[in-house]
Amino acid sequence: MHPTHIKVLTPNSKDLDILCVALSIVKTLDQINDFKILVKQALNQGFDINMKDGDHCTLLYYSCTLKLYEIAQFLLENGADPNIRNTVYDQITPLSVVRTQPKTEQSIYLTKLLLQDSLLKLCQNNDFKIIDNSITVKDIEEFIDWRMSISSKNNEFISYHLKELHNLQNHLVRNTKFSNSEIIQKLDSILITAEDYNKSFEQLPEQLIDKTEAIEPELTGKVAEVISETA
């Protein structure tokens, strides 16, 4: 459902209502900056950036749906959780939303950020070192570094780590100690098969891959340039 039609059912409903409506009309760089100020003000007053509306969607989910990638990065930097699903309709995460959108320099970069943040939160919230015969925090950190690269030369390495994450998930499911663990749900929300990963980028032009590979982890300004050129 579009942000302007949300049904707010939460303690900070007024703030969420205002922010969702403001987000739905953002088009220019000035409006992006104004929205960031609104979010900062709300956060200073105790607003929960991961709050869901009546349709169980977060601000991060809506910003990805509306292709407002700079705002999505801003929300991630301020604590937005990319692992939260839209639990009423399609049951997907912000990452799933961006994956289905046309491959552009900005959308690919945001995909990288969402993947990185998802896996980092997984590392921070859980000590994988206690799990025998599985991956360690070091493995995941290494995986994140390589996952940020989309060039074909790294596909074999990335595929290996995707399989490792699936092995971890299977291990947790079989182990009664972790059978009801939230870790399993989080893994399920971010995992794709190695085959699906490779398919995601096999049709990309080499020029776009080269440009995206060169982008440093800082989106601010990139989307602004595109907006100013098309406004």
Swiss-Prot record:
PROSITE patterns for this protein: ANK_REP_REGION, ANK_REPEAT
SUPFAM superfamilies attached to this UniProt entry: Ankyrin repeat
Record's keyword annotation contains tRNA processing: no
InterPro entries listed in its UniProt record: Ankyrin_rpt (IPR002110), Ankyrin_rpt-contain_sf (IPR036770)
Pfam families, sorted: Ank
ANK repeats: 55-87
UniProt keyword terms in alphabetical order: ANK repeat
Record keyword Lipid biosynthesis present: no
Recorded superkingdom: Bacteria
Protein known as: Putative ankyrin repeat protein RBE_0555
